[in-house]
């Protein structure tokens, strides 16, 4: 399958970059680079541009392949705005029609409301606009999704715990499409490792209020590395653990690769 081949090529390129980095010079600059500063203080917003490619394996032989460019502008360390617009390919499997095109545009505003030693609280709102080229590539609705998460330092483990809650609700759009009303809960964990490597564990519980509060669970583990002063890359596999064939946002398994430039 072409999408799988392209993703395998991306993974191979990233693996080569990961392995090549330890061969660089041993001298380290006194000041943290932009990428290192972001890893050290993840709640200090910095402007960044990134692109990621996610392959989701669905029931049967169906799949989604999603390429998402994202730009985030830090107005100041406590305020940021974000835009992202995915390009998607969806194949339902079973001989169904494959479709490709633009997905829904997402815009976010985020504010770090509290910053104390070892603790921060961020509040944000996403607005997802109905811009998809095809009904199968988007929600068919305009969605508002308020969002809040904390950042709790765990210095004994060189980690940060990010308890995270977000609620998605449709406010406008195609009346023939189903309403959107679900909540996600994510007890995320960032851990820093030697050689500028990090991991980010993201279990996501999704509660769909339109389906009698049916709950799904996906678990993803991102393994990333700082490649230069401004560039980081990552690989993120994931699995669907609960209700993977009964909720639209719970896949069978997925694999994501990405690269980020931090200004």
In which residue ranges do the predicted regions lie?
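Transmembrane beta-barrel domains of Gram-negative outer membranes and organellar outer membranes
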Residues: 26-263
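Cleavable N-terminal export/targeting peptides
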Residues: 1-36
């Amino acid at each position: 399958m072409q999408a799988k081949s392209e993703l395998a090529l991306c993974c191979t390129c990233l693996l080569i970059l990961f392995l090549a980095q330890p061969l660089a010079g041993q001298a380290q600059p006194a000041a943290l680079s932009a990428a290192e500063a972001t890893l050290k203080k993840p709640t200090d917003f910095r402007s960044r541009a990134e692109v990621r490619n996610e392959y989701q394996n669905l029931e049967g032989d169906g799949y989604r392949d999603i390429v998402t460019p994202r730009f985030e502008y830090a107005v100041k360390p406590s305020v940021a705005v974000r835009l992202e617009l995915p390009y998607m390919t969806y194949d339902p499997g079973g001989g169904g029609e494959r479709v490709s095109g633009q997905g829904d545009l997402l815009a976010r505003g985020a504010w770090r409301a509290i910053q104390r030693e070892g603790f921060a609280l961020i509040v944000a709102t996403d607005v997802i606009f109905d811009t998809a080229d095809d009904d199968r590539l988007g929600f068919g609705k305009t969605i508002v999704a308020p969002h809040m998460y904390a950042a709790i330092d765990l210095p004994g483990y060189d980690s940060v715990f990010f308890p995270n809650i977000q609620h998605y609700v449709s406010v406008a759009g195609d009346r023939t499409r189903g309403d959107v009303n679900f909540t996600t809960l994510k007890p995320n964990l960032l851990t820093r490792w030697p050689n500028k490597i990090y991991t980010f564990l993201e279990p996501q519980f999704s509660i769909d209020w339109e389906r009698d509060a049916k709950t799904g669970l996906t678990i993803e583990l991102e393994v990333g590395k700082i490649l230069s002063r401004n560039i980081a890359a990552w690989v993120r596999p994931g699995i669907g653990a609960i209700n993977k064939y009964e909720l639209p946002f719970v896949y069978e398994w997925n694999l994501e690769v990405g690269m980020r430039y931090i200004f």
